[in-house]
């Protein structure tokens, strides 16, 4: 009986780890990202919605709060460059020059929120 229940827990547990992984990490990431967000360039008003309040300084909060496209408040390059430790000026310049070194920059506007979150988790971990 114990074997059955152990196997029964593993079966549903195996295909599910990925979705709950980013869902569970979201709150924790949100806190860490909000901290990094303020530490970088966000004017403190950015932690939650990051809409137009921080148009150029909201790096990490983008995949957490802004919608998939992050078109207005959070620059597309934010989530990909911020975790790499670039300064706001650096990643902004990188955005303007259109450098392809940050291939992940397009993920924010193209991929789903889950993809963005998973990408961010991998970058931060």
Swiss-Prot record:
Keywords: Repeat. Residues 109-118 have a biased composition (Low complexity). It comes from the Eukaryota. Residues 98-108 have a biased composition (Polar residues). Residues 1-27, 81-125 are annotated as: Disordered. This is Uncharacterized protein GAS8-AS1. The lineage of its organism: Eukaryota, Metazoa, Chordata, Craniata, Vertebrata.
């Amino acid at each position: 009986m114990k074997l059955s229940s152990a196997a029964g827990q593993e079966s549903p547990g195996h295909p599910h780890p990925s979705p709950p992984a980013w869902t569970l990490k979201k709150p924790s990431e949100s806190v860490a990202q909000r901290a990094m967000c303020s530490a970088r360039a966000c004017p403190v008003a950015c932690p939650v919605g990051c809409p137009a309040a921080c148009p150029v300084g909201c790096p990490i909060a983008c995949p957490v709060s802004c919608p998939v496209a992050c078109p207005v408040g959070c620059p597309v390059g934010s989530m990909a460059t911020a975790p790499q430790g670039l300064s706001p000026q650096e990643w902004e310049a990188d955005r303007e020059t259109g450098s392809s070194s940050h291939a992940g920059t397009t993920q924010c506007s193209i991929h789903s929120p889950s993809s963005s979150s998973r990408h961010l988790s991998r970058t931060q971990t």
